[in-house]
């Protein structure tokens, strides 16, 4: 049986599956021995009062193994011999446009006037040290776009539209921690 629950736990309980199961058993009256797996679907911090709590939305597997993957894996087709499409810019929009083109069976050719991230670091240090700006390689132009040197915090005001879940799945498929799927404000 698969059930969904919402729990309000202390921070020290959230990172141990057994602690979550024990809390669930006590709070919801479930026999902890029957819980085979707990998957955290959403996690947020409630720091409005003196005691900080973590709000969890969880999927609980009772007497059965988990049936789903943590994230959806996209299988990209081979497009080496397909028609080319030019994508301008290697920022987030260009990279996701390229992935979508591959899904649709096209071969993207990405054009970027800036440098790769490692070379951009050198150019950015020149901006701060001697105020020398390279018009082709700076905070805005180059691999990763303007977000390459951000703090990694992604915010969206949209909860009901857009492809937020798909984008987070793509990040996980390419090496991001699966915790970003559960965190309300993921740090990527």
Which residues are covered by each model-predicted region?
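Conserved N-terminal/central alpha/beta ligand/cofactor-binding core
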Residues: 6-9, 20, 125-188
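N-terminal Rossmann-like FAD-binding beta1-loop-alpha1 element of flavoenzymes
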Residues: 82-117
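Extreme N-terminal leader/targeting segments of oxidoreductases
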Residues: 2-83
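Flexible loop/turn segments at secondary-structure boundaries
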Residues: 117-118, 188
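Charged, amphipathic alpha-helical segments characteristic of ABC-type P-loop ATPases involved
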Residues: 118, 124-125
């Amino acid at each position: 049986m698969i059930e969904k629950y919402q729990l309000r736990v202390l921070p020290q309980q959230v990172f141990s599956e057994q602690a979550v199961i024990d809390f669930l058993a006590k709070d919801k009256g479930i026999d902890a021995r029957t819980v085979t797996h707990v998957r955290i679907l959403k996690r947020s911090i409630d720091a409005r009062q003196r005691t900080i709590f973590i709000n969890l939305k969880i999927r609980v597997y009772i007497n059965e193994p988990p049936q789903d993957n943590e994230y959806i894996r996209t299988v990209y087709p081979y497009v080496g011999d397909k028609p080319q499409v030019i994508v301008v810019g290697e920022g987030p929009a260009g990279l996701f446009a390229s992935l979508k083109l591959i899904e649709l069976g096209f071969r993207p050719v990405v054009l970027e006037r800036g440098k790769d991230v490692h070379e951009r670091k050198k150019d950015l240090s020149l901006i701060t040290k001697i105020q020398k700006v390279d018009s082709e390689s700076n905070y805005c132009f180059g691999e990763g776009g303007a977000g390459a040197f951000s703090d990694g915090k992604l915010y969206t005001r949209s909860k009901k539209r857009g492809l937020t879940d798909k984008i987070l799945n793509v990040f996980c498929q390419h090496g991001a921690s699966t915790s970003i799927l559960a965190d309300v404000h993921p740090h990527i």
